[in-house]
Amino acid sequence: MLRYQIFPLSVSHIKNMFFKKHPKKFFSPEEQERIVEEIRKAEDRTSGEIRVHLDCCAREIPVEKAKRVFHKLGMTETKARNGVLIYLATEDRKFAILGDEGIHRVVPENYWEDVKEKMQKQFREDRVCEGICLGIREIGEKLKTYFPVEKDDRNELPDTISEEK
């Protein structure tokens, strides 16, 4: 299921983007660490894999860019096809939540809608890091219902924030 939405950015985030061009600079080192820790915690409860990808601008429909990033990051290579990507285009102020086909074989069509709305609420309040962390927690909770941790579970994808080079 593909979802994307426009989110507002504060003056401080816009200044950071202007002076720090690289997407990874969008979050402070502390915020980056917090996001990675949320990914690890969420993945401790599910066999699913969660990635966060930052891009300055989608240069196209965000969902289409997210699909390409999803493939580029190898997210279609997980054993159960249960990866989820949070794609964030910082300059365009848009994001997408993209789940792999293994997830969408077993979940309802509007599965990510509540996650999107909760994240967007945080973004509107200039809490972008909290919005991402909340999204990761919510995704982890949802995934554990259909994809609990397996006995032989291993981390199939890096627990890092990727960014457009």
Regions found by a protein language model. Give the residues of each.
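A structural boundary signal for the start of the first folded domain, especially the loop/turn
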Residues: 1-83, 88-165
